[in-house]
Amino acid sequence: MKKAIIIGSGIAGLAAALRLKKKGYQVSVFEKNDYAGGKLHAIELGGYRFDLGPSLFTLPHLIDELHQLFPDVEIDFNYIKKKTACHYFWEDGTSFEAPADLENFAVKAAEIFDEKQNTLSKYLQNSKMKYESTKSLFLEKSLHKSNTYFSKQTLKAILKIPFLGINNTLDQENKKFSNPKLNQLFNRYATYNGSSPYLTPGIMSMIPYLELGLGTYYPQGGMHRISQSLFELAQKVGVEFRFRKNVKKINHSNNKVTGVTTEKGTHDADIVLCNMDVFPTYRQLLQDIKAPEKTLKQERSSSALIFYWGIKKSFPQLDLHNILFSENYKAEFEAIFNNKSLYEDPTVYINITSKQSPQDAPKGCENWFVMINTPGDYGQNWENLVIKAKKNILSKIKRCLNIDVEELIDVEYVLTPQGIEKNTSSYRGALYGAASNNKFAAFLRHPNFNKTIGNLYHVGGSVHPGGGIPLCLLSAKITADLIPNTNA
């Protein structure tokens, strides 16, 4: 049986392990941590459970697909569709519970923001068109294989690109709204790939369709259940996991991969698939080949500063997903991307899974995942920044929600960009690999295969098609499609 080694058990590594197992490979996953899941991990603290990483669940069929690869194996994984996508708040008292469907969103947003319903409906239909026109090219195939460009579907997508807002920024696309709050709301979707709405291309206005058209979901048991269900499935179908095994080198001979070396020895393989960020992959594991410097020098995506707070009270006005908007969105992104600093009036995201899973917090309490977008780690004094950010966040909550939660904080855990990099090997703590702050970004990501070493492949948020749970899962699917079955 042919052997495949996977470096890293993030969501893309887990998905790739299952797909290669289905193709007949003997699969071993080497993971430096003592748990599977990468950023999709969780902690328990003083009776509160917190998902550490991604908090938004869309395109659940991509997880279902993986479970359906092995129909005879039963794994407990369920999810519900949310009626409300997100609850938005501004300092002037404006709030908007965004319905998670296109028609209701247009009706309610028109009422709240005094916008023409027709303008909203057209925008959302345009978002749908952009997604459906380009997903086959940008999300489901390798952009780095010539045969991708010869299908009728791909040629249709390419012909539509000039009409998809590629020459505008997302902010320019969103200027069609008369209310600046609505412009700000739709600009927020740039953060879904760690970019700035004032730089990322207008084609990114397809992202709202994923959330508002295809739906926002919640996995029962929390986001951690996504990675754990795949880990359990992989174990049951015979994937081997080697935890606390730090790969030191990817071995190759005559331009073909031969295996990996850990601290304790060499392991041979016919295929190696790396779920590690491409920057440390080249700098640490592939030091003996010429690295693609142009790719590695791309601007990194934003990172995050996250406070995990156990709150000794419940707040019925809040939902699973909540956003408290900055009064100056442009200045916030300039601070993050230009100055590599934190803005004094940050946009604050609060995720509360105890709204859906009451067992995640003691009775009458809530588990708050409180996040602000930040630059990556460029040597800033994070100890000082954490102190300042906490003060600014508490002040923002007070101004937007008229509540003082400082005295209600029961337990606290903090994760900085430094911590994210340490836990996940994401260079500078970037959440999505490279930023998408130019119109060619989709074509500049590292391919899913290595151009120098045969049978070496790459998956995860730092390669095509990008970061976030759905795109990481698609990277595994694209990559698996490039690898032949063992009987081929």
Swiss-Prot record:
PANTHER family from the UniProt entry: 4,4'-DIAPONEUROSPORENE OXYGENASE, PHYTOENE DESATURASE
Gene symbol of the encoding locus: crtD
InterPro entries: Amino_oxidase, Carotenoid/retinoid_OxRdtase, FAD/NAD-bd_sf, hydcarot_desat_CrtD
Binding site for FAD: E31, K39, S55, L56, V247, N275, L431, G461, G468, I469
Molecular function via GO: nucleotide binding; oxidoreductase activity
GO biological process, one term: carotenoid biosynthetic process
Task performed by this protein: Can also 1-hydroxy-all-trans-1,2-dihydro-neurosporene, 1,1'-dihydroxy-1,1',2,2'-tetrahydroneurosporene and 1,1'-dihydroxy-1,1',2,2'-tetrahydrolycopene. Probably involved in the synthesis of myxol, a gamma-carotene derivative. May use FAD as a proton acceptor.
Pathway: Carotenoid biosynthesis
Family: Belongs to the carotenoid/retinoid oxidoreductase family.
Record key words, sorted: Carotenoid biosynthesis, FAD, Flavoprotein, Nucleotide-binding, Oxidoreductase
Recorded superkingdom: Bacteria
Pfam family of the protein (one): Amino_oxidase
Identification of the protein by name: 1-hydroxycarotenoid 3,4-desaturase
Enzyme nomenclature, EC number: 1.3.99.27
Catalytic activity: rhodopin + A = (3E)-3,4-didehydrorhodopin + AH2; 1'-hydroxy-gamma-carotene + A = 1'-hydroxytorulene + AH2; 1-hydroxy-all-trans-1,2-dihydro-neurosporene + A = demethylspheroidene + AH2; 1,1'-dihydroxy-1,1',2,2'-tetrahydroneurosporene + A = 1'-hydroxy-demethylspheroidene + AH2
Quaternary data: Monomer.
